Amino acid sequence: MRITLPSGTPAEIDLSVANPVMGLVIMPDIFGMRPLFDDLVAQLAREWNMAVIAVEPFPNQTLSADIAERMACVPLLSDDAVLRDMHEAADALGVARVGLMGFCMGGMYCHKEARSDRFARISSF
């Protein structure tokens, strides 16, 4: 289900698991939210018994699938805003223990987030 974080950033969330063992925030790659990540959120929630959310890395932007266009937008991202969105996403899950998983560019943000103690586990691909 699509939600909007308090910051205004869209996210895909699955809270269908009755008693999740923990939560998981997913940071997509440079191509952002798309059906692949919508499906991954649902699959990991179901298979790993977790509350899961994925966050759009380029909120308020309409970008094509062109890699050059997206690469040009990366320097415009605010690390503080992306890290804030990750924390807001974790809060939206409603569980105490939350892990973080990032893919490519999202993995870079996992490494940046490692300096905080918000996430119990961090995995970067």
Residue positions per predicted region:
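Primarily recognizes the serine-hydrolase "nucleophile elbow" in alpha/beta-hydrolase
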Residues: 89-125
